[in-house]
């Protein structure tokens, strides 16, 4: 799933993207889908303290554009909100708009506070830091711990980072891989020449151990509902 913005922050936005490629999006929807991430890359943590109405307005705006230029087959409900931080009051409305799983880091910041956790309480954040998933029954939302950020992990550290996760029955059933695609771009100031190789190493490692790719928003965690 590609998590996308509405605007680059200058003079371009999704409303300018043509629908001439819609057939290609639809033809490839079996492996490639688009989902809301945020209105823009900046500012950081845009929804951490923002009113829920702001998050939902941006979500609806981007969802409408995805349906327009890519079609419903290529659309995914939100999977990762930018910086993985929202008010807890947003979990229910996000569920009502189709999200069933939200991914985050669920780890402590340098200041010792649980972070990138959708403002979840400390007890559940700590539990989720050691497990695959946790369901908030009040909202219905399931939270998934991201197991590796590929662009932040050197090539030779990827397998060592994933090996203990795969070996742990509390964490190894679902492997949540995440990267930031700008590291593929030679024009990006922090371009990583080996980014594609890092992705290949991570995906190859987990598929080599029997895992298969799924869309977590489909059915129940990518599998049938019953």
Feature locations, PLM:
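Loop/turn elements at helix/coil->beta-strand transitions in domains of secreted/extracellular proteins
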Residues: 1, 28-33, 72-77, 96-100, ...
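Metal-dependent polysaccharide deacetylase catalytic core of the NodB/CE4 family, i.e.
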Residues: 2-87, 110-111, 181-185
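Active-site-adjacent pocket scaffolds in enzyme catalytic domains
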Residues: 10-16, 20, 73, 80-176
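Alpha-helical structural signal in soluble globular domains
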Residues: 24, 65-69, 93-100, 201-205, ...
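Short secondary-structure boundary/capping segments
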Residues: 51, 94-98, 193
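Non-membrane alpha-helical structural segments and their capping/turn regions in soluble enzymes
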Residues: 52-60, 155-159, 192-196, 200
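Alpha-helical packing segments of well-folded alpha/beta enzyme cores
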Residues: 58, 62-66, 90, 161, ...
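C-terminal domain-boundary segment and adjacent tail
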Residues: 101-106, 176-226
